[in-house]
Amino acid sequence: MALRLRSGGIVNHELLKAVEQTPRTLFAPPQYQDEVYSKRLIPLECGSFMEGCDMAVRLLHCLNLKPGQRILEVGTGSGFTAAVMGRIAERVLTIDRYQTLVASAQKNLEKAGLRNVVVRQADGSAGVPGEGTFDRILITAAFNSLPRTFSDHLVSGGTLLVPIMMSETHCRIVRVNRTGSRFDREDLFDAPYLPIVPQVASFL
């Protein structure tokens, strides 16, 4: 896997080390254990999915993670990406609208030995009031346009990675870097994300 990631341009040693220290088998459903390191999407509960290994690591590589950072993730899923970020960063807050996924991810993170990752059920479309600012923000549900709420959560020098719906069927990963009051946008690559659903789920 490491050789495949390196050949795909992932050369950040600290990120690769964090990925190797975080077994994806702890985060995937039992019936998909043989495919955890493949490029395919792995179905989760509540209609969610776990990104293919290459896509997950590519997203984290685009964030340029560093020790000491505070990170926000919107869309917890299995908890895998939060776990990898937790190996590098000082603190990770990850939120999801589904309590089922929150509870499952919490168990997965405990099995992986992560103590600096906080998992919370919250409305991912509304930001995280009262949580202050973050060095990095990763969003894994698509918005129709750049979400100002999350841009305001960035420190100067911070980076936001968010899927943006370019059309009804076309989604692209966009990176936003903040410098003071200036926000610089960079369109990166297409990705298979679905539009974000507002409000927390009532029954799942």
From Swiss-Prot:
Its EC number is 2.1.1.77. GO terms for cellular component: cytoplasm. It comes from the Bacteria. One of its GO terms (biological process) is protein modification process. It holds the Pfam family PCMT. InterPro entries: PCMT, SAM-dependent_MTases_sf. Gene3D superfamilies: Vaccinia Virus protein VP39 (3.40.50.150). Keywords: Cytoplasm, Methyltransferase, S-adenosyl-L-methionine, Transferase. The keyword Transferase applies. GO terms for molecular function: protein-L-isoaspartate (D-aspartate) O-methyltransferase activity. It is found in: Cytoplasm. It catalyses: [protein]-L-isoaspartate + S-adenosyl-L-methionine = [protein]-L-isoaspartate alpha-methyl ester + S-adenosyl-L-homocysteine. The keyword Nucleotide-binding does not apply. Belongs to the methyltransferase superfamily. L-isoaspartyl/D-aspartyl protein methyltransferase family. Catalyzes the methyl esterification of L-isoaspartyl residues in peptides and proteins that result from spontaneous decomposition of normal L-aspartyl and L-asparaginyl residues. It plays a role in the repair and/or degradation of damaged proteins. Monomer. This is Protein-L-isoaspartate O-methyltransferase. It comes from Rhizobium meliloti (strain 1021).
